[in-house]
């Protein structure tokens, strides 16, 4: 106020009092403590003389105010008290202005006014371009820049431009890594105040924004705005490229980048670029290992708040999203959205390289890496690289053996959530995916997709090497490895490598002994769910796969597929070493081990090595005595299921496989194939020791025991060891008297099926083998092979002790006992021992008095057929054995042998 103007009307003290009252009336809300007059400004005389009447007072007042207010925290002059108070609250953190609706406090009255507009729903500012409404004029101006593309704020470091100065300021923190905002409760620092506020809301659970329609509350006003559009159905943004309508401008901006391919947000660590900044923020946490969001129930930490939000539903069991088609519920709306495409068949994302379409954009991105070969995620333990971070995370659990997913019903833990879900479906029987063509239901959507290709015949993948067409990309990738020989999946226990990760997983269970799949009927456990699925058909008797050629049915489609090759003669798998072809890839693999000598499976009991795990399993059953497969007809139990099948066919007489050369029928295709080698003379398996060749690899294996003298099969009752399991079984039958094979014609029983088969030919008179040399007809292939050696003089079985050779291996075995003194067959009555079971068999007749052979001439009976044969010569007068020295004749060769000693004078042998 000007002293020249006022001194005529008021005294000086009165003017000063009036000034103070005016100031305090204007700023009465601020409090006396916040006002401080500067030195030299306590009187009104400091103002120079001003011209004017009453207006001079206000002018003088405004001029004086610029000098009288200062901040207590630091010496700073303000032109108005409001600025002084604002600076002070910035230092103290005071929030004087409180919202009556939600209780939130603010430092500035203008912020409170702005906040109240959220509750009132007031949006007075409208965009002329799109018609979008805003609560504040600044937001409208900001929004207009989307349409104009104006970005006046540029980063000097990287050249990136922004439409807001605040965005530029926040962006600069990426370069200098500044974190200006700290959480008071947890001492965490953030680069942006919004991140700090979001972090606080997670811990406090504060959700101030509530939907008027349904009452749902949100942490952020933007989330509420987005949610409200669900009720209104408002989608104001339409994409010119694909026609998609989108509800928010930010989502619209992100969507446009799908078409342009723009990825403006780049990671400084690895150089990977992203189309949205939030994805970059989430990606950075891969490098930093930061997981700021922790579950209060189980303590699990997450990189993203959204993942924590969804994770909580595991504990609550909440699945708020329901499919209208099948009623399936989901924890996330995104999963429901993707699930619906199963019913609609929609696949909007297409690969430009191969034309394959996908229901999810992430699946397309994942697929593209097949073509590029990109594997950016590397394991620090073993160096293995992956094309997705989830695969790397899952892989790491191999090293850590972490199993975070536990089945609540059965307590089993799994390393992958997919394995847990699969495990649950096995027990619940849930099959949500149904084929529209035939109604068949499946546990997994991928199984349904694979099945649907049966109806469509679609096989989009063709192998350039062999021309094979394949239905799925994963199967195609596996198939290519057959030609390349690539085995990228290696077992850390034994070093064995595999072409697929699933095969490695199954293989690992050999080392761990894990058998997670259990049969509900018999309790038998399996390493693979597929084997359990097929095993169940043993109990149900289901054989859904039928051969069109011969009508034979199978439990597995794979068995039918292989079986068809018997009719077609197809052998697509060829050995590069010897050129031999096979109908099955597994047979080729097994055959290759003959050349390599590879034996990966070792028996812990006896230390023996095996080529196949099934052989090892079979060996184990010898020691455990386990025989899980039981015949329903006679109750006999078997160790391998193949023996039960063989036994069943003997009882039923089933012989589906017939030889085109001689008409002989067999119960198994392998027996037919083996038989064919008699006609072809094929013997591909050769012994390195003696050069002897065999038609079967197992015959070669057993033959080698002649040289090594290995006897792996031991009788538990008597302690005797044998080189062959058949010899052990035969030995056991001698002691037990077990005779399981009965002739339907005469009722005679036999210990071995081969003996029954030989016996039956007496009734049928069937003798399919005819000798070209002498015309003799013979009943069995083994006897025919022995007979031919009479003409050829071949004696391939040689005694290592004395060098004597024999025409058959059985004769050699019997001969060896002369040197060893071994007499394995003992009479239970008198304890006498014999070298051969046949001699024991005849000896027993002494005790039983049995004489089954009767002379037709005189009625005399004999224990042995040989004795009857010799006796008959008395009636006929036949004496076929002649002495070369004196011409005397004899009925028996033994008598001739004794007579010769008269001429030689040898008295060492007496008859």
Curated annotation (Swiss-Prot):
Q: What is the annotated localization of this protein?
A: Nucleus
Q: What does this protein do?
A: May be involved in transcriptional regulation.
Q: Which cysteines are joined by disulfide bonds?
A: none
Q: What is this protein called?
A: Zinc finger protein 721
Q: Where are zinc fingers of the kind C2H2-type found along the chain?
A: 69-91, 97-119, 125-147, 153-175, 181-203, 209-231, 237-259, 265-287, 293-315, 321-343, 349-371, 377-399, 405-427, 433-455, 461-483, 489-511, 517-539, 545-567, 573-595, 601-623, 629-651, 657-679, 685-707, 713-735, 741-763, 769-791, 797-819, 825-847, 853-875, 881-903
- Keywords recorded for this protein, A-Z: DNA-binding, Isopeptide bond, Metal-binding, Nucleus, Repeat, Transcription, Transcription regulation, Ubl conjugation, Zinc, Zinc-finger
Q: Where is this cross-link: Glycyl lysine isopeptide (Lys-Gly) (interchain with G-Cter in SUMO2)?
A: 478, 649, 786
This entry's Gene Ontology molecular function terms read:
DNA binding; zinc ion binding
Principal place where this protein is found? Answer: nucleus
Q: Which GO terms describe its biological process?
A: regulation of transcription by RNA polymerase II
Domain of life per record: Eukaryota
Q: Which family does it belong to?
A: Belongs to the krueppel C2H2-type zinc-finger protein family.
**GO cellular-component term (any):** nucleus
Pfam families in UniProt: zf-C2H2, zf-C2H2_6, zf-H2C2_2
Q: Is the keyword Glycoprotein assigned to this protein?
A: no
